[in-house]
Amino acid sequence: VSILAFKKEKEIYAATYAWFTQVGEEVVVGLLGEQSITTHNLKVGDYCGISVCSKEQKDVALYIGDTHSNEVDKLLGLPYFVDSTGAITLKGSKVTMIAKVVDIIHLQGIEADSLVYFKVVEYHDNEKLDYLLMNDIR
């Protein structure tokens, strides 16, 4: 379970996503749902933070996933870091990445969703923490 977050034009966007995977040494791909305000505001060339949740972040992942960025400040009260590009990463995550959007593709059969290719420019792994899995939140 991962959280994608970024600041753009003074607005903060964050969403919980179930599927991100590494497909190259510095390339991550994510399938982002059509219903997400965050997905609609993500453009090629944007930088964003990808926080791979730790087991301790179950409630955070559920809260961010159950709300919309245009309705509430999803990160209010949460410890996070914003870098100079506007990428936001959550403190306490298993893995944090700063990534640049390289391409956004709409695949046949799931055109509404966005398959997003990211180039990872910064990567940190907290080896003391365990990954939050989908089975942990069902």
Write out the residue ranges for each language-model feature:
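Basic, polyanion-binding surface patches
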Residues: 1-138
